[in-house]
Amino acid sequence: MSNRKYFGTDGIRGKVGDTPITPDFVLKLGWAAGKVLARHGSRKIIIGKDTRISGYMLESALEAGLAAAGLSASFTGPMPTPAVAYLTRTFRAEAGIVISASHNPYYDNGIKFFSIDGTKLPDDVEEAIEAEMEKPLTCVESSELGKASRIVDAAGRYIEFCKGTFPGELSLNGLKIVVDCANGATYHIAPSVLRELGAKVIAIGCEPDGMNINEECGATDVRQLQARVLAEKADVGLAFDGDGDRLIMVDHLGNKVDGDQILYIIAREGLRQGQLRGGAVGTLMSNMGLEVALKQLGIPFARAKVGDRYVLEMMQTKGWRIGAENSGHVILLDKTTTGDGVIAGLQVLTAIVKNHMSLHDLCSGMKLFPQILVNVRFTGENDPLEDKSVQQITQDVEKELAGRGRVLLRKSGTEPLIRVMVEGEHEETVIAQANRIADAVKAVS
């Protein structure tokens, strides 16, 4: 992979007010992106955002930079990331830009791009944008400046698109669903989709104030959702992250259902319906239980690097149509071009309705192995993963697992973290082993 200065695995991200998430940087980024994208002919860009208070500031900066490069911006307002990908395709825009830091706290924000076909920008285009950033900013002639406009009923367009992925002969009548929108971009989308399909919806995490996005709610913290599902005696709960590209579910007993289990349900249903093409793609973090369960069904399984862009790349290479991360990014290429929490949820609900089974029962064919993830923050210049003591302890743990588990150490693509994952048959042992490795990483971080 190339050494890009600003772009990580999911665009550009950081703390608001610190480089690169500053108004001047984002203005320059908009200009540089405009210069690169204008070479392809179209001069229209779609811009969406989540509900962070900083979105207004960054949206204005992006628009100014694009206009200076001669490109026009069409705004969606607060909108899920996958909605921007969809609108980019339907409006035949040269690119879509999302202002979001996904599951991060409100004081972070980020910028990510979609190409004209609704997929993430290729590495070479991101590299070209970074190269343009090194040049002095110049403004086009006044007659060539870009304009700004707002897309009429962007939410309604996307709601109808989502509903179109649910079988027309079915409805959600009789289902009680709790939905947690993380005070994020799905707050005005997901409840409407589910209600219009017939469900009784209890909505939480749907009162964004600019600073409560992902705060003890949504896909990264389902405790509120679990409690509400039990209190309401609901059939199922759906939790999205701040920008709506992740889905975590909760069954009627209050059990969390993660991206691995969601992928299993969708793959199994695709096989049952005779619609599964090839196999399923997970990641290095996918639970061994998923691999075992799919193998029992005769469904091929492959692991990509962590990051939804790498899941998508492997899906495209293999010609497979479904893939997911255990964090809840679920990509269904027969339905859309990127991870989409609402659409993934609708496919699981389809399986519930068609099979007359609860979410709990749909998960019963897959047994999760205990998996412990410890995040260790590092600030030093030395790479903890290259340290010999860390490597030795990791090797010792791998020997102890003796092929009945896995160890994975990796750097986060979006934060200064080392992620330590240990997976095995016995939870107490796995916890102790993960902490041993994490302590070794901390000692050299």
From Swiss-Prot:
Disulfide bonds: none annotated. Mg(2+) binds at residues 102, 241, 243, 245. Keywords: Isomerase, Magnesium, Metal-binding, Phosphoprotein. This is Phosphoglucosamine mutase. It comes from Pectobacterium atrosepticum (strain SCRI 1043 / ATCC BAA-672) (Erwinia carotovora subsp. atroseptica). It catalyses: alpha-D-glucosamine 1-phosphate = D-glucosamine 6-phosphate. NCBIfam families: glmM (TIGR01455), PRK10887.1 (NF008139). The gene is glmM. The active site is at residue 102. One of its GO terms (cellular component) is cytosol. Belongs to the phosphohexose mutase family. Its EC number is 5.4.2.10. It holds the Pfam family PGM_PMM_I.
